[in-house]
Amino acid sequence: DSDPSRGLGDVYKRQILHRIKPVEGRLEKIGKLKNNSRVILDYAHTPDALKSAFLNLKEQFPNNNINLVFGCGGERDFKKRIMMGKIAEKYSNKIYLTDDNPRNENPSKIRKDIKKGIKKSNIYEISNRKKAIEEAIKNLNTGDLLLVAGRGHEKVQDYGKRKILLSDKKVILQSINSKNKFLSKNFKLNIINCL
């Protein structure tokens, strides 16, 4: 009987629930496209967090393909890279392997380490994170999910002495907008061709 909501009316509970905002960058549903595909942003940068994100999405969307954009940070937990690759392979349909925050480490070496855990052929290696996200969204099929993992709410990509302003969320929103314009244009063309 230690339920803190005990005695609160259902209407009041619903009002409270509507005010609760999700944590930025944690399984954050950024947008839904006109072809019913969705893009989710998550800070998952460890094997456990990545697996948990996949399992959560599989539970919510059991019949949808899940594609993944991710990389691993530099100068951190070298051993986790192969494990992250194995998890990506097990739970995703397409993998867009890209840079995370390489810091002072060679980004291509980081990607090479991750690929040791991936055996499937549907892996696209695009070092430029912005381009990787754009490409992944451009290639979303009807009902697909895209999980963009690793950096969450971060606004700066760390290349050691070089820092790049990069918000995964902004890139996602811009790419969704472009994809939706493309889908609308194609829908109109299809209607005209059917007449």
Residue ranges and their predicted role:
Residues 10, 15-195:
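ATP-dependent carboxylate-amine ligase
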